[in-house]
């Protein structure tokens, strides 16, 4: 079945930027605001100096800043930001998830919007330049790619990219786990549930910045999230009232 494109209005696209001890450049935030209707930065319990810098950036650019009192993990920060964004009125038609460390460039947003006219989940694909990725991250990504293909029966590309666009059913996808495994669990649920998932090329940008990703511990959690069955919300079904039988009254 051919899916007819539904153009996305950039003014109805909100961005969510989780941050733990990362301060986005003001120029990056301002450029991003030229592509989206609003931005929510989630400070995931950063150290005081970084928290102060994030407040400064938010004040200078007029974006919304939400702060966790202590570090909860990227998955928790994404849930906080997505929840806050979806409470906007009017409700956004789509959300863009983007990291604060400068790896994700605002100039890629139009490609995400174009792909989002037919797909429900759009993910940045760094596989065109794997050599620029640290070997630990490259290995973890390639292993998780194979595991996800085996467990879902669908071909996938970059499974670890944090730059994503969500629309339609993808806006309600769960983020199981508080760490980096949340994004992997989100992708697996989308694939299992038959959502239209696609990838768009983005640059592979790694500098000398410190990363909160712990290769052994976080890779193990990601792998576990890909192997375990898809989690469903524990919601009790609402049953219709049982018709009264003639012998119910004793």
Feature-to-residue mapping (PLM):
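Hydrophobic helical membrane-anchoring modules
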Residues: 1-18, 22-24, 175-250
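Short, well-formed alpha-helical segments that are part of the catalytic scaffolds
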Residues: 19-35, 49
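Donor nucleotide-sugar binding loop of glycosyltransferases
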Residues: 21-25, 46, 74, 105
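Short beta-strand/loop segment that forms part of the nucleotide-sugar
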Residues: 37-46, 66-68
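A conserved acidic beta->alpha catalytic loop
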Residues: 43-52, 102
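Alpha-helix termini
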Residues: 58-60, 84-93
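Acceptor/aglycone-binding surface of glycosyltransferases and processive sugar-polymer synthases
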Residues: 69-84, 106-180, 207-217
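Short beta-strand-to-loop acidic/aromatic patch adjacent to the donor-nucleotide binding site
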Residues: 89-103
